[in-house]
């Protein structure tokens, strides 16, 4: 193979060796072939790269100039990949045990507004489980309320997720504007702080 002469003998030009212009075309052809097969039985290949690998000019044995970006491959059955992704996004779960001999509405009084979307019997328990979702439009927090089978005087409340908004029962104000001692039914916080009420931790 005849290589072009290098006008600068003190450096080696490798641009002729690094030809990656056809890489994208080749990869697209491979992905088209994979796409023609049955995805339910074939492994799935997912690839991501933000930049191309470009040519390098080596000016000395100790100095290189090579621009690369990481490539990530995820190989496996489609269902397995979905399970792995779901596992990474598991919600934050908190369980509280509250003594209450009245009804489950007491467990709803946590400072947030909830919308009931279901009720389901529990195997081996005379008490059903109630399902609620936060009524704030962009909040995905859910909670389940049920009586403890071993001790019906207690209610188990399971929270999934974390609220992305303050509690509606918390009033934000400037402390100079109000006499805080005269309004005992409210939980006050100063206007320049943004935190959740201790009465509604999740």
From Swiss-Prot:
Localisation: Nucleus
Database matches in PROSITE patterns: WRKY
Entry GO MF terms: DNA-binding transcription factor activity; sequence-specific DNA binding
Protein keywords: DNA-binding, Nucleus, Transcription, Transcription regulation
DNA-binding region, residues: 103-168
Statement: the UniProt record of this protein carries the keyword Transmembrane: no
InterPro entries hit by this protein: WRKY_dom, WRKY_dom_sf, WRKY_plant
Transmembrane regions listed in the UniProt entry: none
One family name in Pfam for this protein: WRKY
Record's GO cellular component terms: nucleus
Gene3D superfamilies the record matches: WRKY domain (2.20.25.80)
UniProt KW Transcription keyword: yes
Biological role stated in the UniProt entry: Transcription factor. Interacts specifically with the W box (5'-(T)TGAC[CT]-3'), a frequently occurring elicitor-responsive cis-acting element.
Record-stated family: Belongs to the WRKY group II-c family.
Protein name: Probable WRKY transcription factor 59
Lineage: Eukaryota, Viridiplantae, Streptophyta, Embryophyta, Tracheophyta
């Amino acid at each position: 193979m005849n290589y072009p002469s290098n006008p600068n003998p003190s450096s080696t030009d490798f641009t002729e060796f690094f030809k990656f212009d056809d890489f994208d075309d080749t990869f697209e052809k491979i992905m088209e072939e994979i796409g023609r097969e049955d995805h339910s039985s074939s492994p799935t290949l997912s690839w991501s790269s933000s930049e191309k690998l470009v040519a390098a000019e080596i000016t000395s044995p100790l100095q290189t100039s090579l621009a690369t970006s990481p490539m990530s491959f995820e190989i496996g059955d489609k269902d397995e990949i979905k399970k792995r992704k779901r596992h990474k996004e598991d919600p934050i779960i908190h369980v509280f045990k509250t003594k209450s001999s009245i009804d489950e509405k007491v467990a709803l009084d946590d400072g947030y507004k909830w919308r009931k979307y279901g009720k389901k019997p529990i195997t081996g328990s005379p008490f059903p489980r109630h399902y609620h979702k936060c009524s704030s439009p962009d909040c995905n927090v859910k909670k389940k309320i049920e009586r403890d089978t071993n001790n019906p005087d207690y209610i188990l409340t399971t929270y999934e997720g974390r609220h992305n908004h303050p509690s509606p029962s918390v009033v934000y104000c400037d402390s100079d504007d109000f006499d805080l001692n005269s309004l005992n039914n409210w939980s006050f916080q100063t206007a320049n702080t943004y935190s959740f009420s201790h009465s509604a931790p999740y």
